[in-house]
């Protein structure tokens, strides 16, 4: 599995021959990539705020993985998409898309947007992406990446996502103000019991400017064994 960070919460994930793009927003200071250089098979949207769907219109006709509310908003405003299941998915569900299995879990955040469902974008979420189907009855080897979306610290990270979905790596927001800051994000990494942790959603605009070393130090302070990788924009990590 290859993970490429394009700044903010935008990630490109390659699972065998399937390319996924999460929260496309290339108008951020971390990346020089032209969004039209990418040709994902599926776009995954954690929620409908502008800094997470800002470039989704570049991928009209692409497969779309999001809640029904966000799917309808994208169709109403950006054109036609091939929504997974015809109308999207929802929290707790797992879908098989190409070579990847994607489970959507809730995130503690807001999601205000005007949709045909009303003045709400539904619950925001995060994605657990794996190369094998999640199960409790097999010891098959798997590689699993958790994109937490915009969120605060949740006990579900400790009680559900970590022990049952068993991510090897997690990208967590650390910018504070709108999401977790370095201290809470470090606790999330510890609770998730991952081998690799990546900070995201920081240094995009003034309210979320931080020192990433604070996050590194906080992870160490929890006693976690996770390796923290502060990627440069457009950098790829092989998981």
Swiss-Prot record:
Q: Name one GO molecular function term.
A: hydrolase activity
Database matches in SUPFAM superfamilies:
Metallo-hydrolase/oxidoreductase
- List the keywords (alphabetical): Hydrolase
Gene3D superfamilies (alphabetical): Ribonuclease Z/Hydroxyacylglutathione hydrolase-like
* Entries under HAMAP family matching the protein: UPF0173
Family stated for the protein in its record: Belongs to the UPF0173 family.
For this protein, the record's PANTHER family field holds:
UPF0173 METAL-DEPENDENT HYDROLASE MJ1163, UPF0173 METAL-DEPENDENT HYDROLASE MJ1163-RELATED
Which NCBIfam families does the entry mention?
PRK00685.1
Q: What is this protein called?
A: UPF0173 metal-dependent hydrolase rrnAC0300
Name the species this protein comes from: Haloarcula marismortui (strain ATCC 43049 / DSM 3752 / JCM 8966 / VKM B-1809) (Halobacterium marismortui)
The organism's lineage? Archaea, Methanobacteriati, Methanobacteriota, Stenosarchaea group, Halobacteria
């Amino acid at each position: 599995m290859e993970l490429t960070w394009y700044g903010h919460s935008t990630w490109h994930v390659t699972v065998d021959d399937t390319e996924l793009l999460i929260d496309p927003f290339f108008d951020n200071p971390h990346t020089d990539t032209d969004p039209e250089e990418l040709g994902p098979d599926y776009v995954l949207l954690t929620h409908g705020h502008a800094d997470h769907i800002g470039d989704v219109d570049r991928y009209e006709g692409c497969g779309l993985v999001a809640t029904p509310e966000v799917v309808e908003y994208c169709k109403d405003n950006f054109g036609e998409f091939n929504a997974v299941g015809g109308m999207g998915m929802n929290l707790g569900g797992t879908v098989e898309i190409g070579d990847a299995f994607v489970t959507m879990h809730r995130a503690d955040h807001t999601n205000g947007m005007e949709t045909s469902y009303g003045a709400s974008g539904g619950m925001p979420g995060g994605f657990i992406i794996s190369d094998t189907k999640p199960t409790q009855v097999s010891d098959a080897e798997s590689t699993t990446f958790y994109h937490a979306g915009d969120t605060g610290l949740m006990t579900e990270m400790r009680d559900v996502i970590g022990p049952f979905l068993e991510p090897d790596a997690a990208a967590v927001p650390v910018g504070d103000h709108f999401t977790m800051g370095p201290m809470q994000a470090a606790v999330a990494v510890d609770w998730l019991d991952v081998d690799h942790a990546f900070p995201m959603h920081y240094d995009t605009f003034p309210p979320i400017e931080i020192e990433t070393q604070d996050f590194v130090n906080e992870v160490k302070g929890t006693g976690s064994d996770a390796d923290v990788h502060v990627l440069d924009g457009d950098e790829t990590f092989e998981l």
